[in-house]
From Swiss-Prot:
UniProt-listed GO biological process terms: fibroblast growth factor receptor signaling pathway; positive regulation of cell population proliferation; positive regulation of ERK1 and ERK2 cascade; regulation of bile acid biosynthetic process; regulation of hematopoietic stem cell differentiation
Signal peptide bounds: 1-19
SMART domains for the chain: IG (SM00409), IGc2 (SM00408), TyrKc (SM00219)
Protein name as it appears in the record: Fibroblast growth factor receptor 4
List of glycosylated residues: 46, 96, 107, 219, 332, 369, 401, 422, 433
Post-translation changes: Ubiquitinated. Subject to proteasomal degradation when not fully glycosylated.
Topology within the bilayer: Single-pass type I membrane protein
Stretches assigned to the Ig-like C2-type domain: 27-134, 143-223, 258-351, 360-460
Enzyme Commission code: 2.7.10.1
Keywords: ATP-binding, Cell membrane, Disulfide bond, Endoplasmic reticulum, Endosome, Glycoprotein, Immunoglobulin domain, Kinase, Membrane, Nucleotide-binding, Phosphoprotein, Receptor, Repeat, Signal, Transferase, Transmembrane, Transmembrane helix, Tyrosine-protein kinase, Ubl conjugation
Residue intervals of the Protein kinase domain: 578-866
């Protein structure tokens, strides 16, 4: 049933592209690719027309065949629940449109003046664009000297308009053809009209005329809107930037050089946004005459053809809009505003943060089940996390002909609310004056260009009789609780009284002499363990610490501590033959530096070899030293292996402890992959850098295979790594993968798991659920981490669970969510990742099985270079039917695996070809 609901919601979110009428039952399915853009910018256009004239409003569509459109007019005299003007529908919902849609206005009257809205929707979402129609009763034969002024004010501002004339006492003011009357809020003094505390109803066209004539001296288009921030909000909010004056705007009509109207909104100069977001830069300004604006990028003129995906230059709104930004959009963006009296400029810095794309994530536990009383109110909350702009719908499951499901098993629903994330309170569904018919299941559906997610909750409606019964039951329950609580408190008080009485009868003994007794003890700092090994079975040295202990309760005195490290001839390397070089990195308890070791190669004593040296920091503690020694001793008992970092020698005498290990010249696997990403990837690590080598798909499989071999060897030595990740795998000059960082590793001999009991920083995004929640570490928990490492490999160094807070990750893992298939991965290899992420540890494969499977895949593929523009199914030797994959072609973050035996969901394109949706519109 869960799979059916997911299939149904996928169709619903794509706006009924393949829908079926409930009444007629006739299908009209058509699989159409839709553009991310819906309406062409710049349409419809503002118009000014005389009474009795005609005008055509034009809306241009990008994909008319898959788009539905409707025309509205804003009624500024009526406000909706969110405080915005009510939209009055002028046409029904239009379908099967041409590329250009025209709404004609004929025989225009003064009542036709106002704002007209073109609203379109398709599977990509919704878009609205509007235009003002200004209606003039009559104009004088002589043209007015001043042009029409367009002003935008915020709620609560003061509007002051001046009409330039020699006869100020003979001026009358009209709004949309109706004379403006003087009242407590509107003051008309001679040729000046002042409106205090403006509201939405004050929006419109104002005209000043000479009394007794029909000569329009001047007209003003006024728009009142909410305060508009200068963040990177969506472009489809129908908001306008302030292009007019502030509270006192008398001086706007005199000659003046450009100036900023809202400098406080331009204080934020650095924008750091995730890739895929929409960015809007604003430079609200004015002047007289009205200035023009142009945009520069890094000091050069910036036009739409300079950027893939184009730009939107909304000059009348003083804004630059860029959709779906990528790292190549980074740079300095400057607006230059100028007229004949001067020019001003302002610069923004844009930094696009690298993110792997993902579908929306819904906060766990929301929406919640709700109970309401008949006639009361209720609300559902749905918290959405999404880098790309999401579209949200609220659905109610309904019954048709006595059934909640159609003949094909898909449930019936109706849409009760829809909108984008930046619309007012779209994440909240309000239900008022509830009746019994409102009871049922409600779903929150959120989707973006990558995919969709949904969660449901139930509304229970109680009658007054049900409420009375509930109250009686609660009162009875509370009575029982009070009785039991009173009895418990009485028992506790009795025990306390008895204890106090006994203390009075038997007074406490005199305390012992608390003089500190000093003694000297010598004890092992850490118990050493041995593992049977042909090469290093003699390594069982004890580390001793000498310290002064006090028997008093005061802290241990700061005395000299002496550590005794025994000399090991098999591993000791002369300190004078070692030349330290530049640092390579820092760990949790020490640092690693590059060094040259003379004679460390026993086969060639005269050879100078490059090594990596692990050592402690200056502020290291006893525990840090013990951890480094533990790692050293663990590496001693390991045989040489090609896919692990091997120990070469140690320096324990006459100086600080040095641990000499193999040097890997190409650094960590994570940075190795990132540095070799193709330049065409939207989230390339460095867009200016040409990859040193072009990786093949076989190279990626080889990386996973080599790491699996190294982990198979560690598992055979009963060693649990606990921090397996791409950052802890090093790459040599010959592209050999070597597992490193045994700082968190623990040897196991008689038990097969290690349970962590101390608190510390742990790699939570790589940890298995049993390690994360129960602190139990096994070889199977390392297998889980290996699955995450495979995901890193096939995303070329991507970050797991991008943009998900750690607290939210805990909930998602408990609910069974798993990461989706990377776009550069075959179905077969993704299934191996999913096996590694099995909720039951014993059901995960062993490293030996993983080595065998990856070896088989490696043998069956050829050296083909990566092409990230196409899916990787072509490289799969065994996955013939890709349509049944558990993930879409897009690279999203999560898929849900509530049950291990849950069947795979159909892909999106298969859904459209096989299923129909039954919906009704409220």
């Amino acid at each position: 049933m869960l799979s059916i609901l997911k299939v149904f919601i996928a169709i619903c979110f794509m706006e009924l592209v393949c829908s079926r009428s409930i009444t007629s039952g006739e299908p009209r399915a058509k699989d159409i690719r839709v553009s991310r853009h819906i309406l062409t910018p710049g349409y419809p256009e503002n118009a000014t027309v005389l009474v009795g004239g005609h005008v055509k409003l034009v809306c241009k569509l990008h994909q008319p065949a898959s788009t539905r459109l409707q025309w509205f007019k804003k009624d500024s005299n009526r406000l909706g629940p969110d405080g915005s003007p009510v939209l009055t529908a002028l046409t029904p919902l239009l379908e099967n449109l041409s590329k250009v849609n025209i709404f004609p206005l004929v025989n225009i009257s003064l009542e036709d003046a106002g704002e007209y809205v073109c609203k379109a929707e398709n599977s990509a979402g919704q878009a609205t664009r509007s235009a003002w129609v200004e209606v003039l009763s009559e104009v004088s034969e002589e043209p007015t000297e001043e042009p029409s002024e367009h002003l935008l004010l915020e709620l609560g501002d003061v509007l002051k308009l001046r009409c330039d004339t020699n006869r100020p006492g003979a001026v009358q003011w009209f709004k949309s053809g109706v004379r403006v009357q003087h009242n407590a809020r509107i003051q008309i003094r001679a040729a000046v009209m002042e409106i205090a505390d403006v509201t939405y109803e004050d929006s419109g066209v104002y005209v000043c005329m000479l009394r007794g004539t029909k000569e329009a001296l001047r007209n003003f288009t006024i728009t009142v809107a909410d305060a508009v921030g200068s963040g990177d909000d969506d472009d489809e909010d129908n908001g306008l930037d302030d292009i007019g004056p502030e509270t006192e705007n008398d001086q706007v009509y005199i000659s003046r050089a450009p100036y900023w109207t809202h400098t406080q909104r331009m204080e934020k100069k650095l924008y750091a946004v995730p890739a895929g977001n929409t960015v809007k830069f604003r430079c609200p300004a004015t002047g007289s005459p009205l200035p023009t604006i142009r945009w520069l990028k890094n000091g050069r003129e910036f036009r739409g053809e300079h950027r893939i995906g184009g730009i939107k230059l909304r000059h009348q709104h003083w804004s630059l809009v860029m959709e779906s930004v990528v790292p190549s959009d980074r740079g300095n963006y400057s607006c230059v505003v100028e007229n004949k009296y001067g020019s001003i400029a302002h610069t923004y810095l844009l930094d696009v943060l690298e993110r792997s794309p993902h579908r929306p994530i819904l906060q766990a536990g929301l929406p919640k089940n709700t109970t309401a009383i008949v006639g009361g109110d209720a609300q559902f909350l749905c918290k959405v996390y999404s880098d790309a702009q999401p579209h949200i719908q609220w659905l109610k499951h309904i019954e048709m002909n006595g059934s909640r499901y159609g003949p094909d098993g898909i449930p019936y629903v109706k849409i009760v609310k829809t909108g984008s994330l930046n619309m007012s309170e779209v994440e909240v569904l309000y239900l008022t004056n509830i009746s019994m018919e409102d009871a049922g299941e409600y779903s929150c559906l959120a989707g973006n260009s990558i995919g969709f997610s949904h969660q449901s909750a139930w509304l229970t409606v109680l009658s007054e009789e049900d409420v009375a019964k509930e109250v009686d039951l609660m009162e009875a329950k509370y009575t029982d609780i009070i009785i039991y609580a009173s009895g418990f408190l009485a028992l506790v008080m009795a025990i306390v009284i008895v204890v106090l009485c006994r203390m009075q009868v038997h007074p406490s003994r005199e305390p012992f002499d608390t003089l500190p007794v000093q003694k000297l003890s010598k004890f092992p700092l850490r118990r050493q363990y041995s593992v049977e090994s042909n090469s290093s079975g003699k390594s069982s040295a004890s580390l001793m610490r000498v310290a002064r202990l006090s028997s008093s309760c005061s802290p241990m005195l700061a005395g000299v501590m002496e550590f005794e490290l025994p000399y090991d001839p098999d591993w000791e390397f002369p300190r004078e033959n070692l030349t330290l070089g530049k640092p390579l990195g820092e760990g949790c308890f020490g640092q690693v530096v590059r060094a040259e070791a003379y004679g460390i190669n026993k086969e060639n004593q005269d050879h100078m070899a490059t090594v990596a040296v692990k050592m402690l920091k200056d502020d290291a503690t006893d525990k840090d030293l013990a951890d480094l020694i533990s790692e050293m001793e663990l590496m001693k008992v390991m045989d040489k292996h090609k896919n692990i970092i091997n120990l070469l020698g140690v320096c324990t005498q006459d100086g600080p402890l040095y641990v000499l290990v193999e040097y890997a010249s190409k650094g960590s696997l994570r940075e190795y992959l990132r540095a070799r990403r193709p330049p065409g990837m939207d989230y390339t690590f460095d867009v200016t850098k040409v990859p040193e080598e072009q990786l093949t798909f076989k190279d990626l499989v080889s990386c996973a295979y080599q790491v699996a071999r190294g982990m198979e060897y560690l598992a055979s030595k009963r060693c649990i790594h606990r921090d397996l990740a791409a950052r802890n795998v090093l790459v040599t000059e010959d592209n050999v993968m070597k597992i490193a960082d045994f700082g968190l590793a623990r040897g196991v001999h008689q038990i097969d798991y290690y349970k962590k009991t101390t608190n510390g920083r742990m790699p939570v995004k790589w940890m298995a659920p049993e390690a994360l929640f129960d602190r139990v570490y096994t070889h199977q928990s390392d297998v889980w981490s290996f699955g995450v490492l495979m995901w890193e490999i096939f995303t070329l160094g991507g970050s797991p669970y991008p943009g998900i807070p750690v607290e939210e990750l805990f909930k998602l893992l408990k609910e069974g969510h798993r990461m989706d298939k990377p776009s550069n991965c075959t179905h077969e290899l993704y299934m191996k990742m999913r096996e590694c992420w099995h909720a039951v540890p014993t059901q995960r494969p062993t490293f030996k099985q993983l080595v065998e499977e990856l070896d088989r895949v490696l043998v069956s593929i050829s050296d083909e270079y990566l092409d990230l523009s196409t899916p990787f199914e072509q490289y799969s030797p065994s996955c013939e039917d890709t349509s049944s994959s558990c993930s879409s072609d897009n690279d999203s973050v999560f898929t849900h695996d509530a049950l291990s035996t849950e069947p795979c969901l159909l892909g999106y394109h298969d859904v459209h070809s096989r299923m129909d949706l039954k919906t009704t519109m409220r």
